[in-house]
UniProtKB/Swiss-Prot annotation:
Record-given protein name: Elongation factor Ts
The organism of origin for this protein: Staphylococcus haemolyticus (strain JCSC1435)
Pfam families: EF_TS (PF00889)
Annotated HAMAP family: EF_Ts
Keywords associated with the record: Cytoplasm, Elongation factor, Protein biosynthesis
Any GO CC annotation of this UniProt entry: cytoplasm
Record region (Involved in Mg(2+) ion dislocation from EF-Tu): 79-82
Amino acid sequence: MAISAKLVKELRERTGAGMMDCKKALTETDGDIDKAIDYLREKGIAKAAKKADRIAAEGLVHVEVKGNEAAIVEINSETDFVARNEGFQELVKEIANQVLDSKAETVDALLETKLSSGKTVDERMKEAISTIGEKLSIRRFEIRTKSDNDAFGAYLHMGGRIGVLTVVEGSTDEEAAKDVAMHIAAINPKYVSSEQVKEEEINHEREVLKQQALNEGKPENIVEKMVEGRLRKYLQEICAVDQNFVKDPDQTVEAFLKSKGGKLVDFVRYEVGEGMEKREENFADEVKGQMK
């Protein structure tokens, strides 16, 4: 099959491998990008791939905390200009509050709920679209709860480009919980701890690392030990509690929270537009679109 330049570019961005290596990997795997990543890793050409999610859409993430409940919300706009608009920022906060007040479980259910003004969220969104002049949409939200003996950590990076909500058990130190939220914003772990990693993912990683070691020409009798060592390192890279804490790399996140009497039990990290693709237009088409 013909391998498109766009696919090669994506594989290069995700693996850091050279253009010809990427093209060969895609050819060998019939254009399957995930298999091509494994191929490059097994050959020792690429490290573990970056997340596939391409950040393209605009908007804001907001975290709202009320007592023992907290909500994290993402609302999308078409342009970054609108995301910086004060009216849009107020709208995002208003919707986050409504998520907590309504206890809605889905976006569709949330849209039907009534605000204190008597309008539904759907009517409020349409009103904002009319005022701001751009398509706006509530993309997702999640609610977390805690006890009086626990703490929420809320952190917004770049004014809401990234938002993190952490739940720390056994400590009411909100500053420590926020510091861990900041760590998660920066490092972007996938899990709280290795206990959350599915066996399927561990087995897949183990197989890739085994092929990598064999392709390096390592004796089979030491391959297993090497694989387990590399697997531990991989798990450290994706699990928050095992990572070196960004504000104090001499200790892990787990050790930092333990010193405060707490333990990380949950987190939610939203990055605006992750997994979404912006419509691709060249400058000439953009100008034509504005002249219509």
